[in-house]
């Protein structure tokens, strides 16, 4: 495949994803380093069918697709060289607010750790009421950060290691649904993607 970095270079060189696909046969003349394997990857009928299936899922489930060019795309993430070209989102939140706190921690949180997490999130809600909490949806500190944010009525977003056609772990589904009104679920992965270790 082309990957995030390769796709970003193509779009930077040509102008947009639409232009890259529209002018794919001309790419070797327009951009140094583009070879036939890239054109083959861009010309893959199976990839087009997969993209159509994904868009049907997006529309049916009222998801938001954020591309690197979208103003709503998380600006801090956009600065990373390997930022995903497309993000899929379900929920309601501004990713580009002034205060964003990413919280991660052990999956085997102690009672002290859980209480510290809850107290920290509560203090944030008092000091920075517009704060956005971002974490995974895993056991331990991840899920406790989201639950603390919900309890203190502050925005919280879970970054998922799989597509939006599933929730993993399933026991966190209620919390995930509760987050949709003031935060939501974000992923770079297509549907039918399982939460493999390399995705975390």
What label would you give each PLM region?
Residues 1-123:
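Short, positively charged patches
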Residues 67-200:
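Glycine-biased, small-residue-rich flexible motifs in mid-sequence functional cores and linkers
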């Amino acid at each position: 495949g082309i990957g995030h970095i390769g796709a970003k270079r193509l779009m930077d060189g040509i102008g947009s994803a639409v232009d890259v696909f529209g002018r794919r046969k001309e790419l070797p003349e327009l951009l140094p380093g583009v070879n036939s394997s890239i054109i083959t990857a861009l010309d893959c009928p199976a990839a087009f069918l997969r993209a159509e299936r994904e868009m049907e899922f997006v529309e049916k489930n009222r998801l938001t697709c954020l591309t690197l060019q979208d103003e709503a795309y998380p600006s801090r993430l956009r600065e990373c060289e390997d930022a995903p070209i497309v993000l899929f989102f379900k929920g309601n939140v501004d990713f580009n607010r002034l205060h964003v706190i990413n919280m991660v921690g052990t999956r085997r949180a102690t009672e002290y750790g859980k209480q510290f997490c809850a107290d920290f999130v509560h203090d944030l809600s008092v000091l920075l009421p517009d704060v956005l909490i971002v974490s995974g949806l895993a056991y331990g500190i991840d899920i406790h950060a989201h639950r603390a944010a919900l309890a203190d009525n502050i925005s919280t977003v879970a970054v998922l290691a799989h597509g939006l056609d599933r929730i993993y772990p399933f026991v966190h589904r209620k919390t995930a649904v509760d987050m949709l009104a003031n935060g939501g679920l974000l992923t770079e992965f297509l549907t039918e993607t399982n939460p493999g270790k390399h995705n975390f």
